[in-house]
A protein has these predicted regions:
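Membrane-anchoring alpha-helices and their flanking helix-loop junctions
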Residues: 1-123, 152-206
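Solvent-exposed interhelical
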Residues: 127-145
Length: 206
């Protein structure tokens, strides 16, 4: 990688660490009022993500084009826009149920990230082709884990604002998937894997 690319990646890691610190502070303030386990589970997932971003192994195939960089920044720091206001948000179903949904999403994330290991990162890159475990079902299982966790959070903190934020987030996530696959398809092994595993995001659906 060039010096400029190294600086950009380091800056993104610092921003990610700063963002999760800000989010953790807000979650803690929210927990003192609502005692919502769901929010704590969501925080645990974000901490896991940032930890893996920081320790991700370097690669020369990362995509530093402006569009994937911007999509990654906006999608990775969505929690700056999430509302945790217990006075305006609506709890649609009990916290015990939404916590269960969020835990299921977090467990799936961990399951997928164990298989991916240090090949995880914020920007699209071709590090290692993984085709075992959850990657046998869908090509982007980590995103699916995020989605399930976020659905648990939304059912516990429902508002039109949060719906809008998450809709925007998953439009960006889908854009990231497309750019990630453009980079990964440089590898013939990944092109063969893509032919075998038809579903990108949700098992047997999408």
């Amino acid at each position: 990688m060039s010096l400029k690319q190294i600086i950009l990646e380091l800056a993104m890691k610092i921003m990610a660490a700063s963002g999760i610190t800000y989010f953790a502070h807000n979650i803690w303030l929210n927990y003192q009022t609502t005692h919502s386990i769901t929010s704590l589970i969501m925080l645990a997932g974000e901490i896991l993500t940032i930890t893996l971003v920081i320790i991700a192994k370097p690669t020369n195939t990362r995509d530093f084009n402006p569009i994937p960089c911007l999509a990654t920044i906006l999608a990775s720091f969505y929690f700056f826009f999430i509302s945790l206001d217990s006075e305006t948000n609506i709890q649609i179903i009990p916290d015990s149920v939404t916590a269960g949904i969020a835990i299921a999403g977090l467990v799936w994330q961990i399951y997928a990230k164990i298989y991916l290991g240090r090949s995880f990162g914020l920007l699209p890159a071709c590090r290692t082709v993984v085709d075992t475990g959850p990657y046998k079902l869908i090509r982007h299982p980590i995103y699916f884990g995020y989605f399930v966790t976020h659905m648990g959070f939304l059912l516990n903190n429902f508002s039109l604002w949060n719906v809008t934020v998450l809709l925007c987030l998953y439009l960006l996530q889908f854009l990231r998937m497309i750019y990630e696959e453009n980079v990964l398809c440089q590898n013939e092994q990944y092109r063969e894997y893509k032919q075998r595993v038809k579903y990108r995001f949700i098992p047997f659906v999408l």
